Amino acid sequence: MSRKFKIRVPVPSFAFVVDGETEIWYLEMLKRNERGINLRIKPEIPQKKGLDDQFELVCNLASSEYDRVYWIVDLDTIIKESNEAPTGVKTPLTSFFEMKTYLSDKLQNVQVIVNNPCLEFWFLLHFKRTSRYYRRCSDVTRELKKLLKGYEKTERYFTKRDNDIYLQLKPYL
């Protein structure tokens, strides 16, 4: 009698390129709570990287072992940097849209996710439908605090054992 071999189904692998700690904390909780998901968060150690560095990392990851690469960008940061840019110089916003266009045209396994203005707006959408425009992340955070009791933008809040940010938002997905 021959042995039966179980055919292994490959688990898709995902890489996330993020520019802030909030995104890293959320994704770490996703990974902790959804064990079947194979994802990597880049950079592993949060450091303020410019758009050019993030873009280069996205391109490198897209041509490596990952099935899908997600680049999560907070638009409020890009707009702030664009407003502070000297006149006559290409703004970070213009550069970002060029990068986004390149990625959508050339790399099919890359998804650019733009938070407008920040990730907290996406959290807010878990609780209520709104098309309201928020200029600043602080405006969104104020609204979010009404719906997520005790919300604070800290690692301690995001990673609480048995009540982390992912578990609080999951029922509203």
Feature map (PLM): residue ranges:
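Eukaryotic endosomal/vacuolar membrane-trafficking regulators centered on PX-domain-mediated PI3P pathways
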Residues: 47-53
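Conserved beta-strand segments of the P-loop GTPase G domain that flank and frequently precede/overlap
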Residues: 17, 71-74
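Catalytic nucleophile-elbow at a beta strand-turn-alpha helix junction centered on a G-D-S/GDSL motif
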Residues: 15-25
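C-terminal accessory helical subdomains adjacent to catalytic cores in phosphodiester-
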Residues: 2-11, 24-25, 29-43, 57-68, ...
